[in-house]
Curated annotation (Swiss-Prot):
Organism: Archaeoglobus fulgidus (strain ATCC 49558 / DSM 4304 / JCM 9628 / NBRC 100126 / VC-16)
Subunit structure: Homodimer.
Cofactor: record remark: Binds 1 Mg(2+) ion per subunit. Binds 1 zinc ion per subunit.
Biochemical pathway: Amino-acid biosynthesis; L-histidine biosynthesis; L-histidine from 5-phospho-alpha-D-ribose 1-diphosphate: step 3/9
PANTHER family according to UniProt: HISTIDINE BIOSYNTHESIS BIFUNCTIONAL PROTEIN, HISTIDINE BIOSYNTHESIS BIFUNCTIONAL PROTEIN HIS7
Protein name: Phosphoribosyl-AMP cyclohydrolase
Length: 108
């Protein structure tokens, strides 16, 4: 079975700290981003807003060295296990999942 990309040629990527197992972020990758990740050992993604490839930490220095890549049972999602340098989130938080949903109010 092959990886199952969506109609836009993307696959969701969950990124997790290899040591702590903390979930750091959710992003998307296309085939080229996955190939670059495998070739370089550093996480590459597809930016849906900018519509271009990006190496995580390219400007901030907060790179992700990929230790292992796993795929799920349906071959439609990836898990990058990484060594995170600095913070993963553009807000300055270590993880993008730093807020808790309580009640019915969501502030984005």
């Amino acid at each position: 079975m092959e990886l199952q990309f969506d109609e836009k040629g993307l696959i969701p990527v969950i990124t997790q700290d290899v040591k702590t197992k903390e979930v750091l972020m959710l992003a998307y990758a296309n085939e080229e981003a996955i190939k670059l990740t495998l070739k370089t050992g550093f996480a590459h993604y597809w930016s849906r807003s900018r519509k271009k490839l990006w190496k995580k930490g390219e400007t901030s220095g907060n790179v992700q060295r990929v230790v292992e890549i796993r795929y799920d049972c349906d071959c439609d999602a990836l898990l990058y296990l990484v060594e995170q340098k600095g913070n993963a989130c553009h807000t300055g938080n270590y993880s993008c999942f730093y807020r808790r949903l309580e009640g019915d109010e969501v502030r984005c």
